[in-house]
């Protein structure tokens, strides 16, 4: 919960749905799978299981950031790196905290042991995806502060057998950014920026495969 009780779950879901709408309209050949379409809680592992079950090619985990530092603001993207020791670990700790509501939280510690091995198969493509989204959002939202692409051990990304990134759309604990995120028009702009990044990544990826 952020400034004036703005809730991350509502912000993130709306951006995800807007993103899905852009993808369906501009790239109808894609099959868009949502981990949730209303106000329900789905365990972190169940989200990646759903993506794997549907043989997903890209996994996007969309969130709104928070910090005790009210001045913290900006858009950032994270890649999976279980052994991260930089300040990104604070974000990972917060995003991973939801496992306390699950039946078997110990499973995540076990899965993290294998994450660094399995991640190597998708790390390069995940980085390309992250850079593409970051570049597009910067273009579509030039006044938004860009915090860059970082790495941390996010449980929600562990086990997804595909390129995957975690997106933090902005800080709901920052007054000005929370007010922006609370506007439908801004969330649509944000979703469009993410869409353009995904579209660019897919087109580049497909082009490389054709030229091989």
Show where each model-derived region lies.
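Active-site-adjacent mobile loop/cap segments within catalytic or ligand-binding domains
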Residues: 6, 68, 115-212
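Catalytic-core regions of hydrolytic enzymes
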Residues: 1-110, 119-131, 211-212
């Amino acid at each position: 919960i952020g400034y004036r009780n703005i809730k991350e779950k509502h912000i993130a879901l709306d951006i995800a749905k807007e993103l899905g709408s852009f993808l369906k309209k501009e790239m109808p050949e894609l099959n868009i799978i949502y981990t949730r379409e209303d106000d329900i809680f789905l365990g972190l592992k169940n989200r990646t299981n759903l993506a794997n079950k549907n043989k997903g090619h890209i996994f996007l985990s969309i969130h709104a950031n928070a910090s005790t530092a009210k001045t913290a603001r900006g858009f950032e993207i994270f890649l999976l790196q279980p052994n991260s020791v930089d300040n990104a670990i604070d974000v990972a700790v917060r995003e991973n905290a939801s496992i306390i509501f699950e039946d078997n939280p110990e499973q995540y510690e076990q899965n993290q042991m294998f994450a660094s091995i399995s991640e190597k198969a998708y790390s390069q493509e995940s980085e390309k995806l992250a850079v593409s989204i970051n570049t597009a959002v910067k273009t579509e939202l030039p006044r938004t502060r860009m915090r860059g692409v970082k790495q941390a051990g996010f449980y929600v990304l562990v086990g997804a057998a595909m390129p995957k990134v975690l997106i933090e759309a902005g800080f709901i604990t920052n007054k000005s950014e929370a007010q922006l995120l609370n506007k439908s028009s801004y969330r649509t702009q944000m979703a469009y920026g993410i869409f353009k990044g995904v579209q660019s990544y897919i087109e580049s990826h497909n082009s490389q495969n054709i030229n091989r």
